[in-house]
């Protein structure tokens, strides 16, 4: 692995810490290059890992291995009577969004509990699992390329994830794959691995139990140890015409609230400082359960978005909400933010502003209503940061429709914006809509949108100069004496950074600092820390 100057997140397992991967290594080696990202903002040429149109959490064989190699440090001392026979090694490639990343974490955790190890490269793996993405056509191609690379470099490959629904397509292109499963088919993946690479025999010492000795309650995480994604539901009840997620992952299925809170508490106990709440439709949480009441810590809790937010707040760590639809009950959650009970950050995929295009998309919102809601939220919580994504060049989009979107952005003054040009996805209803927009027009509109938003972002960040902010340290460059941090306004991977100069040796990754903002660019802040 190449040398790097930044200080890695500590991955050594203590009894109260989850295994995790250093964020530094996240882009050093990818079997399948992340070319399947949607068109990204104009900042990507300068900051290639930020301001993405979607969360992209690609992880490679090498990166996945570092997670469990950290866990081996614990088992070396905690299970000295473990079998001397080498455990089989599984390679892992994880493509796509944070929801898929959580699926990968769960599969790796279960395999590790069964005594498997994670390989550091294709050649050292007894088998490779590829967790695929099928959200847009370029993601499909990236996944197929990753499968092909795994087959050519290893030969024994199991495919899972969203593209697994297209098993015939996968087998037609790659007939050598051993098994294909769909999204969140955890047990099917575990069984397929065990079929082709039998579980290790731990019978030499009956006291050795990898389910107890290897992994703690928090499980293995593919994120740095100070933040983690917490998935609260799967699937979606909406039928947006550009999206095939419901056909890949099904209708909304919410986790009972006690299950969510048990995982959240385990992550806090493991040292996590920030929880990123994710799902396909976060604010619809509990709808399918009819808001069933469960008991947690002796208290009744409804499986309801607002109640969940209240309970998560009581943990006393950062809680960040992603993929929130602007339903009316979100207003009450913003009130919690105004009371300093949640991070004042909302990731809401508005997608467009033209009523005609929103109707063609089958989106459950109207631009005038969303503008009114944004203004109301800022009255309730003046510090609120709003991130959104938009589709440019949707079929039938006219210049008038696009100008409506630009005018809306001027009025809304969003803090963070990602965008991508529309592309066909096999199975999407929008493919059959008339008047598709030429590619050159899509790109020209995309660039105009991002230029406008860049100016808005720069203006908003200039207003931060001279103020103090609490930031969370993600990385440290000891040679330069700079801490790379995030404030409440910055989600990992997709938003900006706060660069803090002249830090001392006592500053650590995962630590909170109170800093003074000295300068700003279009997307990042620059600060000083007095200790």
From Swiss-Prot:
Positions with biased composition (Low complexity): 68-77
Domain annotation Radical SAM core: ranges: 222-459
All residue ranges annotated as the TRAM domain in the record: 462-531
SMART domains, alphabetized: Elp3 (SM00729)
Cofactor notes: Binds 2 [4Fe-4S] clusters. One cluster is coordinated with 3 cysteines and an exchangeable S-adenosyl-L-methionine.
Localization per Swiss-Prot or TrEMBL: Cytoplasm
GO aspect biological process, one term: tRNA modification
Binding annotation for [4Fe-4S] cluster 1: 97, 133, 162
Region: Disordered, residue numbers: 1-77
Keywords assigned by UniProt, alphabetized: 4Fe-4S, Cytoplasm, Iron, Iron-sulfur, Metal-binding, S-adenosyl-L-methionine, Transferase
Gene Ontology terms for molecular function: 4 iron, 4 sulfur cluster binding; aspartic acid methylthiotransferase activity; metal ion binding; protein methylthiotransferase activity
Polar residues composition bias: residue spans: 1-19, 55-67
Cross-referenced SUPFAM superfamilies: Radical SAM enzymes
Residues binding [4Fe-4S] cluster 2, per UniProt: 236, 240, 243
EC id: 2.8.4.4
GO cellular component: cytosol
Catalysis performed (reactions): L-aspartate(89)-[ribosomal protein uS12]-hydrogen + (sulfur carrier)-SH + AH2 + 2 S-adenosyl-L-methionine = 3-methylsulfanyl-L-aspartate(89)-[ribosomal protein uS12]-hydrogen + (sulfur carrier)-H + 5'-deoxyadenosine + L-methionine + A + S-adenosyl-L-homocysteine + 2 H(+)
Pfam families in alphabetical order: Radical_SAM, TRAM_2, UPF0004
Cofactor: [4Fe-4S] cluster
NCBIfam families given in the database record: 30S ribosomal protein S12 methylthiotransferase RimO, MiaB/RimO family radical SAM methylthiotransferase
Homology family: Belongs to the methylthiotransferase family. RimO subfamily.
Function summary: Catalyzes the methylthiolation of an aspartic acid residue of ribosomal protein uS12.
PANTHER family hit by this protein: RIBOSOMAL PROTEIN S12 METHYLTHIOTRANSFERASE RIMO, RIBOSOMAL PROTEIN US12 METHYLTHIOTRANSFERASE RIMO
Protein name: Ribosomal protein uS12 methylthiotransferase RimO
Species name: Psychrobacter cryohalolentis (strain ATCC BAA-1226 / DSM 17306 / VKM B-2378 / K5)
């Amino acid at each position: 692995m190449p040398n790097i100057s930044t200080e890695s997140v500590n991955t050594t397992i203590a009894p109260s810490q989850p295994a995790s991967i250093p964020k530094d290594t996240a882009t050093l080696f990818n079997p399948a290059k992340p070319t399947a990202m949607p068109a990204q903002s104009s900042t990507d040429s300068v900051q290639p890992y930020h301001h993405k149109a979607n969360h992209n959490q690609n992880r490679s064989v090498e990166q996945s291995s570092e997670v469990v190699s950290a866990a081996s440090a614990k088992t070396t001392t905690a299970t000295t009577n473990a079998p001397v026979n080498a455990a089989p090694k599984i390679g892992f490639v994880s493509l796509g969004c944070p929801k898929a990343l959580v699926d990968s974490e769960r599969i790796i955790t279960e395999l590790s509990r069964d005594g498997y190890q994670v390989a550091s490269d294709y050649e050292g793996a007894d088998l490779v699992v590829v967790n695929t993405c099928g959200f847009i056509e370029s993601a499909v191609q990236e996944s197929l390329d990753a499968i092909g690379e795994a087959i050519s470099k290893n030969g024994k490959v199991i495919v899972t994830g969203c593209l697994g629904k297209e098993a015939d397509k996968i087998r037609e292109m790659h007939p050598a794959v051993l098994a294909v499963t769909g999204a969140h088919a955890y047990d099917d993946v575990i069984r397929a691995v065990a079929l082709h690479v039998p579980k290790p025999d731990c019978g030499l010492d009956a006291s050795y139990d990898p389910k107890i000795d290897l992994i703690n309650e928090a499980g293995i995480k593919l994120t740095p140890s100070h933040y983690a994604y917490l998935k609260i539901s799967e699937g979606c009840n909406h039928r947006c015409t550009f999206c095939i997620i419901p056909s890949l992952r099904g209708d909304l299925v919410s986790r009972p609230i006690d299950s969510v809170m048990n995982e959240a508490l385990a992550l806090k106990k493991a040292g996590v400082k920030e929880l990123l709440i994710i799902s396909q439709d976060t604010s619809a949480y509990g709808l399918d359960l009819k808001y069933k009441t469960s008991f947690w810590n002796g208290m009744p809790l409804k499986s309801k978005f607002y109640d969940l937010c209240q309970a998560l707040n009581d943990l006393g760590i950062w809680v960040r909400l992603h993929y929130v639809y602007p339903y009316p009950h979100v207003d009450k959650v913003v009130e919690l933010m105004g009371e300093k009970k949640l991070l004042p950050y909302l990731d809401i995929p508005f997608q467009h502003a033209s009523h005609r295009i929103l109707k063609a998309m089958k989106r459950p919102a109207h631009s005038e209503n969303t503008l009114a809601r944004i203004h109301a939220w800022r009255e309730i919580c003046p510090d609120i940061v709003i991130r959104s994504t938009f589709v440019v060049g949707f079929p039938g989009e006219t210049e008038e429709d696009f100008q409506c979107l630009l005018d809306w952005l001027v009025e809304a003054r969003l803090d963070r914006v990602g965008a991508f040009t529309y592309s066909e996805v096999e199975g999407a209803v929008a493919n059959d809509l008339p008047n598709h927009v030429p590619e050159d027009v899509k790109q020209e509109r995309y660039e105009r949108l991002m230029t406008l938003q860049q100016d808005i972002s720069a203006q908003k960040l200039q207003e931060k100069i001279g103020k103090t902010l609490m930031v969370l340290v993600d990385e440290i460059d000891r040679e330069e004496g700079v801490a790379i941090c995030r404030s409440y306004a910055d989600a990992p991977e997709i938003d900006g950074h706060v660069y803090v100069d002249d830090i001392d040796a006592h500053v650590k990754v995962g630590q909170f600092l109170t800093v003074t903002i000295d300068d700003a660019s279009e997307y990042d802040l620059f600060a000083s820390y007095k200790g």
